[in-house]
Amino acid sequence: MLTRYPKDCSVPGCLKTNLVKLSNHLANVHFMSKEERKPYLQEARLFFKEYKNVNTLESNLVPHQPLNVMEVTLKHPTNIQVCGPTFCGKSYWTEKLLRNVDEMFSEKIEKIVYCYGEFQPRFLDMERDIHNIQSIEGFPEDIYSLFNNKVGILVLVDLMNESTSKDSMVNVITRGCHHRNISTLFLVQNLFPPGKHSRTISLNTHYIVAFKHPRDSLGVSILARQAFPNATKYVMESYEDAVQNPYGYLVFDLHPSTSEKIRLRTSIFPDDQQVVYVRRI
């Protein structure tokens, strides 16, 4: 269980897997009476009944009600930005998403176009293992012809400078995404990359996956002030918790149809214990 009881507990036993152990821990370590333990146990009961977990790492974060699977599925067509420095885990995260594409998206994906700047041998493994994926070097000149009216995903890896300066990229994100049924996924090294169309691309991005970036934590702070102007502390606490482990990340779900209660998540893949950060109102 991911919930911490209470915030300042340094005892590993504070992370409990059943109500009996949690109750004993609160009584013996935190010296809580039966009445004092009751709200913690009531809160924990929600988690043990459901396969989705919510992290309540700070006093201003509280548990959310059980989630419906469709609530946390990526809504296609959409635009996704995966951000972080070299070796942070962006490429691995993207590959894992594509390998679980049927479970991760709201629609059946028929074609994946994977565009890269530098060839890597693992691209051959992806073409062998992932159905209907096509690898292309460089930024494609005619994007729509590659999909032939199929429901698809355009992935751009190590093409930050090219993609943010191309008119065709803006057309895909602002018009093609909706009218051509194409989702875009692009990997960048900072949240606000330079480029002719970077601001337009950023404003039309529905999901931002932010990895740990020791040299650019200001970028997350700016994003927090833009998307959550009255809750920047909540966002930064969530981000710091999500990236505390190697290759950790925080998903900013900014899709218009997403519930306000589940906009910050981590560990989102089918074999993970998904975590949702919820603000105390």
Name these PLM-found stretches.
Residues 200-281:
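Conserved GTP-binding G-domain of TRAFAC-class P-loop NTPases and closely related GTPase folds
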Residues 9-11, 59:
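Short cysteine-rich clusters marking metal-coordination/redox-active sites
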Residues 66-68, 77-102, 106-113, 117-234:
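Conserved P-loop NTPase motor cores
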Residues 46-59:
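Intrinsically disordered, low-complexity regulatory regions of eukaryotic transcription factors
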Residues 57-74:
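Pre-Walker A adenine-sensing motif
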Residues 1-5, 17-48:
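C-terminal recognition-helix end and immediately following basic linker
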Residues 26-29, 38-46, 114, 191-193, ...:
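Short amphipathic alpha-helical segments embedded in low-complexity Lys/Glu-rich regions
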